[in-house]
Amino acid sequence: MADSEGTESGDGTEAAERAGGWFLVEAVVDRTTGYQVSSDEEDNSIDTGEDLVDFIDTRRPGDGQEVPLALFVQQNAQDDAATVQALKRKYTCSPASSTCVSLVDSELSPRLDAIRIHRGQDRARRRLFEQDSGYGHTQVEIGASESQVPGDAQHEGGGESVQEAEEERGGGDGEAEATGNQETQAQEQAADILEVFKVSNLKAKLLYKFKDLFGLAFGELVRNFKSDKSICGDWVICAFGVYHAVAEAVKTLIQPICVYAHIQIQTCQWGMVILMLVRYKCGKSRETVAHSMGKLLNIPERQMLIEPPKIRSAPCALYWYRTAMGNASEVYGETPEWIVRQTVVGHAMQEAQFSLSMLVQWAYDNDITDESVLAYEYALLGNEDPNAAAFLASNCQAKYIKDAITMCKHYRRAEQAKMTMAQWITHRGRKVADTGDWKAIVKYLRYQQVEFVPFISALKLFLKGVPKKSCMVFYGPSDTGKSLFCMSLLNFLGGAVISYVNSSSHFWLSPLADTKVGLLDDATYQCWQYIDTYLRTVLDGNAISIDRKHRNLTQLKCPPLMITTNINPLEDPTFKYLHSRIVVFQFLHKCPLNSNGDPVYTLNNENWKSFFRRSWARIEGSDQQEEEEEEDEDGVTSRPFRCVPGEITRPL
């Protein structure tokens, strides 16, 4: 080996050859600066600076050693950078990884950790406490399964060093792997729970689960509504998979929308299950209930069973009554009457037997003579009237309705036959409000060029039923308001209509037997021929014989009769025998209409009442008018009709 520049011969050369020749000179320390002094140095030696001369690079450029030295420095720098990077990857991790999550966020405050926007996958590690999101263990597992699926793929590439570091901290005892297996099983179980609500026969599974939880079938508590549009006030609702916090809050949230609520809550592997009996403030359909409860409970509508309760089932009422007494139910509001009626002893003993006389009295007071109207209106009183409730519980409703209408007609017919025409007009006027104007009728007669005084005179004889004067004929072209005028008067007087189309029947005149006034509308030439042949006695106002179905011939005095026609019988000599039996008024002008198509002159019951009261002195006399005024001041003094037996208090 050649002598290196700056290297002295002797011991230094041997030392350089022994070390491999990588250093140039071996320095000998004679004296150091600073506060510490080596023990092998002499205190009195003088520092000449000769040891610093050897550190100066005095070699010549171009000797071939620049490139190896630069390469050596570069390789050392790369090795140092790789070592530092490995240490960073080993001991420094992402803020979202489980090893760097703050204990305040993950362990001490799980609810604060639950609202984080970006969350990574938590590695399995030893924990002092189980995580609690505030929504129950089932919902935590479901949420974890949904959030951990993308986390696995996210940490595949860069999570190896983190895993190694955690295994080193865990001591390598395999506990992390066991905990990870448990979380994997929980994720699979949560995925199975979510798949339960996606099956095709979901309703069957819900019904099975309901019976498993509550111990009875859902169909034993409810009655089925096929239509989702049917309205009902009481509903039984069973909701599955509800959040724990929502299940507790629904006890308060449902109170503003209902008057009664019975809530039971059960827990299963599907989550919270809520059974409710709710009475809303107004009737709702199943579609409306499902929509509102779906928003309130934050679950899909298909996860609910909604049907109305069995209100006439004693076991069903007893179930709600007994469960309401336990501590497993939350009850709000007043208990429905159908539960009280079937469970409380006092109400059960107060159930009354059905009384037909009360039904007849109700129909008479409300002036109902139609069977369908009576059946419907009386059934609506089932929740208020005990007799109506007993009527609904009876198996002979059709028979009761028919008998009640028959008796009501008998009472009405006898009451009507007992009254004179003046009393009947007064009786009909009591049912009409005092808001009419008689001038509308007078203006209409003046518009049709009918003199008022002759009309009042004819109307007076007509209402009294004077022979030969009890038939008024209104003649004129079409659209002149003849039928409008006569129908309005007939409606106020409560009369009946007969039609010539039924003249082939023996019973077409039978409506005249139960009325005070009759009307034959739109009589044609054939009708006048029939009247001239068979009904001359009817126009006279004398007693006639009427054939009524399933009864013997009835003899009675024919009531006053009004006839409308387009033919003037006074101009036809064929009907000369009818001229003395009828009074004819001509309506020659078309009935005026306003922009809405309504008649300009209003002919209603209120106006007719005002008309009769105004012209009562000319029609009936001053005595009847004074009697009418006394009734207006003092009220009706006669007792109302009563067909219900009174209660007699008997002494002991």
Curated annotation (Swiss-Prot):
One of its GO terms (molecular function) is DNA binding. Residues 623-635 have a biased composition (Acidic residues). The keyword Zinc-finger does not apply. A motif (Nuclear localization signal) lies at residues 88-90. There is a cross-link at residue 557 (Glycyl lysine isopeptide (Lys-Gly) (interchain with G-Cter in SUMO)). ATP binds at residues 476-483. Residues 145-185, 620-652 are annotated as: Disordered. It is an enzyme of class 5 (isomerase). Pfam families: PPV_E1_C, PPV_E1_DBD, PPV_E1_N. Residues 450-600 form the SF3 helicase domain. A motif (Nuclear export signal) lies at residues 108-117. The modification Phosphoserine is found at residues 94, 98, 109. Its EC number is 5.6.2.4. Keywords: ATP-binding, DNA replication, DNA-binding, Early protein, Helicase, Host nucleus, Hydrolase, Isomerase, Isopeptide bond, Nucleotide-binding, Phosphoprotein, Ubl conjugation. It is found in: Host nucleus. Its main location: host cell. InterPro entries: Helicase_SF3_DNA-vir (IPR014015), P-loop_NTPase (IPR027417), PPV_DNA_helicase_E1_C (IPR001177), PPV_DNA_helicase_E1_N (IPR014000), PPV_E1_DBD (IPR046832), PPV_E1_DBD_sf (IPR046935), Rep_E1_papillomaV (IPR016393), Znf_lg_T-Ag_D1_dom_sf (IPR037102). One of its GO terms (cellular component) is host cell nucleus. It comes from the Viruses. Belongs to the papillomaviridae E1 protein family. ATP-dependent DNA 3'-5' helicase required for initiation of viral DNA replication. It forms a complex with the viral E2 protein. The E1-E2 complex binds to the replication origin which contains binding sites for both proteins. During the initial step, a dimer of E1 interacts with a dimer of protein E2 leading to a complex that binds the viral origin of replication with high specificity. Then, a second dimer of E1 displaces the E2 dimer in an ATP-dependent manner to form the E1 tetramer. Can form hexamers. Interacts with E2 protein; this interaction increases E1 DNA binding specificity. Interacts with host DNA polymerase subunit POLA2. Interacts with host single stranded DNA-binding protein RPA1. Interacts with host TOP1; this interaction stimulates the enzymatic activity of TOP1. This is Replication protein E1. It comes from Human papillomavirus type 61.
